[in-house]
Design a protein with these regions (language model features):
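Short helix-loop-beta junction
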Residues: 114-129
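Short gly/ser/thr-rich secondary-structure transition/capping motifs
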Residues: 130-136
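Helix-loop-strand module that forms the ligand-binding subsite of alpha/beta enzymes
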Residues: 136-203
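Metallo-beta-lactamase
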Residues: 1-69, 75-77
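Short, highly selective alpha-helical patches that border small-molecule cofactor pockets
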Residues: 109-113, 117, 166, 196
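Structural motif
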Residues: 5-6, 66, 97, 150, ...
């Protein structure tokens, strides 16, 4: 709406989270929405980074006073921050830090993940997030994969393939075409190391 400098943005600039009372950012404590915006982008919009960049370029010459997204608050005060978050995420620019996502059947791959985390910490990396993919909501795992620059995936071999929850995660990552990550992988096995081979192919 040109005369009001207002845009109805659909899924763009949205976030997860209920509106507890107010509906505009000036009526709400917005602290809880920033991480939920990253989770929302990662899971709903993440595949479309190039399209988001194209849309942001079109908006760069337009004065915007209000953003009405399909999900989340109406943005009035925090427009610059909201656009900045979407700009960074759609460029696939991760923060310094490492996500270790792993599946484990008997605890051995989990032990490896914990040892890797200890070594990373010993080498000065402070932002380290471990995710056991068997027990965690994948939307939060994707959120952190979009957030941080380093990604390490570990899997035991399961029926000559990846552990199912790990395989699902790799498919979700591939669907979103996540770029600009430093990637490593590890695995555990006895008689067949197929999981490591599959992760090497995924890399």
């Amino acid at each position: 709406v040109n005369e009001d400098k207002l845009i109805f943005s659909g899924d763009a600039f949205g976030c997860f989270g209920t509106l507890d009372g107010g509906i505009t950012d000036s009526q709400l404590n917005t602290d809880k929405y920033w991480s939920e915006m990253v989770r929302y982008y990662s899971n709903i919009v993440g595949k479309y980074g190039p399209a988001v960049q194209t849309a942001l370029k079109k908006l760069s010459d337009i004065e915007i006073k209000t953003i009405c997204s399909t999900h989340g608050p109406i943005w009035e005060k925090e427009i610059t921050r909201v656009i900045g978050i979407y700009d960074r995420l759609s460029r696939y620019e991760g923060e310094l830090g490492v996500v270790i996502a792993y599946g484990s059947m008997y605890g051995h791959t989990e032990q490896m993940a914990e040892e890797i985390a200890r070594e990373l910490a010993a080498n000065g990396i402070k932002e380290i997030v471990l995710h056991n993919v068997s027990h965690e909501d994948p939307s939060y795992i994707l959120q952190n994969i979009f957030r941080y620059r380093g990604l390490i995936i570990g899997s035991p071999t399961y029926s000559n393939r990846l552990f199912p929850a790990v395989e699902t995660l790799t498919e979700m990552i591939a669907t979103r075409d996540i770029k600009n990550r430093t990637f490593a992988y590890f695995g555990s096995f006895t008689w067949a190391g197929a999981a490591v081979k599959h992760l090497a192919a995924f890399a």
